[in-house]
Amino acid sequence: MKIRASVRKICDKCRLIRRRGRIIVICSNPRHKQRQG
């Protein structure tokens, strides 16, 4: 899980989700997991 100021999709399978007011990227590739800090 990377915490970043700006999250973006890295590949086609990345999905942007809003959870508890935070933007999260989930993907089948675990390296692409991100959260907005």
Swiss-Prot record:
GO terms for molecular function: structural constituent of ribosome. The gene is rpl36. It is found in: Plastid, Chloroplast. PANTHER family: 50S RIBOSOMAL PROTEIN L36, CHLOROPLASTIC (PTHR42888), LARGE RIBOSOMAL SUBUNIT PROTEIN BL36C (PTHR42888:SF1). It holds the Pfam family Ribosomal_L36. PROSITE patterns: RIBOSOMAL_L36. It comes from the Eukaryota. This is Large ribosomal subunit protein bL36c. Belongs to the bacterial ribosomal protein bL36 family. The lineage of its organism: Eukaryota, Viridiplantae, Streptophyta, Embryophyta, Tracheophyta. One of its GO terms (biological process) is translation. GO terms for cellular component: chloroplast; ribonucleoprotein complex; ribosome. Keywords: Chloroplast, Plastid, Ribonucleoprotein, Ribosomal protein.
